Amino acid sequence: MLKREMNIADYDAELWQAMEQEKVRQEEHIELIASENYTSPRVMQAQGSQLTNKYAEGYPGKRYYGGCEYVDVVEQLAIDRAKELFGADYANVQPHSGSQANFAVYTALLQPGDTVLGMNLAQGGHLTHGSPVNFSGKLYNIIPYGIDESGKIDYDDMAKQAQEHKPKMIIGGFSAYSGIVDWAKMREIADSIGAYLFVDMAHVAGLIAAGVYPNPVPHAHVVTTTTHKTLAGPRGGLILAKGGSEELYKKLNSAVFPSAQGGPLMHVIAAKAVALKEAMEPEFKVYQQQVAKNAKAMVEVFLNRGYKVVSGGTENHLFLLDLVDKNLTGKEADAALGRANITVNKNSVPNDPKSPFVTSGIRIGSPAVTRRGFKEAEVKELAGWMCDVLDNINDDAVIERVKGKVLDICARFPVYA
């Protein structure tokens, strides 16, 4: 007989120590990586459930294994909630990650060698939008589009590239772009050449669910997202669509299973269902509104302290600091802030003279700090501390002083009570 109340600490002290150290790190560090967030205890409870034991290849009502009557209920709840939350009429909740979801879309809509128009990674795109080191860049002919001198997406250049190269698919979405994307304009460009519009909304899904950022679902042929990041659920992927054909939806389902994956992770799908329900609550909208307010408040401080923000501001949860004028690399800034218990990530900026392993910028996001209760006053104070560190990157006394302030505010705003 298996006893569920057993403690890992009693069995595997070495592993438990690492887990406990990570728990302490999360409580004692300020998390500003834009793609990270804190999920709820309810989500973690679902993800740690006995559903992990069940194989369920196939889809609700059409499984290859017996004993799926209850996991069918779980998956259907997740599907229905995803469709309701984002205004879709199709949802696949099985992708293990956002990259897996994107791979399924490529598989369903394209053939290897087809031409794809995607956002340049160096100007805000994502690995799966055509990076040469990713499957997308290896299997498909990628034509990049980017941003103009003001830091906004260059739709004129996008349209020109579309007419010249006639891609079969245009990708919208980003991993480091702080503006509003005109999904309708992108669909217009796609329609002008008979291309698919595929949107990866992973970074802004939570903002979209709360009505804080424009929803691409009514405009795109297919939309993908992660279920963590701003959505604050478990790590996983999701595919959505509206107004498509049954043939398209069958292709998408087949591209997930059996093409790319086998058995779905039913414990994670249950956790997705919980997170999607949480995203329908009124307090989730308040949270997402605060995420956007906090990002803007931080930008204001950095600009006032003489730092360059790419595109001059933010309309979502993230922004990039361009450190070229400060003669700092992103790697140096990342390390110095880390010594003060502030976690960011180095990030390339437009026309970056440094390699992707060094970079000339850092990416900053507000979802996690907002989740632990920070509002404008706290994030403005935090941004000021960050400027103190970046202004005195080799001054250990300044960094230690900021670290002390970070530890104090983290104690006042715990992640988990």
Swiss-Prot record:
Chief location bin: cytoplasm
EC number: 2.1.2.1
Annotated compartments: Cytoplasm
Binding locations of (6S)-5,6,7,8-tetrahydrofolate: L121, G125, H126, L127, S355, P356, F357
Gene Ontology CC terms, in alphabetical order: cytosol
Family label: Belongs to the SHMT family.
Protein known as: Serine hydroxymethyltransferase
Organism of origin: Klebsiella pneumoniae subsp. pneumoniae (strain ATCC 700721 / MGH 78578)
Source lineage: Bacteria, Pseudomonadati, Pseudomonadota, Gammaproteobacteria, Enterobacterales
The gene coding this protein: glyA
